């Protein structure tokens, strides 16, 4: 069976509460709808984090969903707080998924034009397609358009596909 086919089609998105990850969540929700896939929203905490960090992670996931889609998501979605390193965990969670969507800055402190080490790792190690939603600060006009009810989470130039 091809990745992402059958009754458990999935689109995975990593969120951390940043504008870029919220744009990634909107993009992932749109893509899940277009693909008739289940949406999996992942927030990663360090492996040794305590229960309070996990509870905060679920609060952040709920906030991200409310912020990204004030009227609610139109697809079934699974929210998950996972433990580990963000990049490795997102690649593991995306195994067999049709798409992994992540947010990233266009320029990072690491010198990577598409963001930090999470982006680089996901692009290098994910088996499927990776979609990158880049620097949302540069797209304030788009945010205003969304507030006016027009769609679009990420500009097309911000996509990275493996």
PLM segments and residue spans:
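Short, surface-exposed alpha-helical segments at coil->helix boundaries
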Residues: 54-65
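Short acidic active-site motifs
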Residues: 85-90, 117-118
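Small/aliphatic-rich secondary-structure junction motif
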Residues: 2-52, 77, 152-162
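Short helix-capping segments at alpha-helix termini
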Residues: 68-74
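Glycine-rich, Arg-bearing micro-motifs that act as flexible, cationic patches
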Residues: 102-125, 139-142
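Short, glycine-/small-residue-rich phosphate/pyrophosphate-handling segment
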Residues: 130, 135-162
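An anion/phosphate-binding loop that grips the pyrophosphate of nucleotide cofactors and donors
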Residues: 97, 126
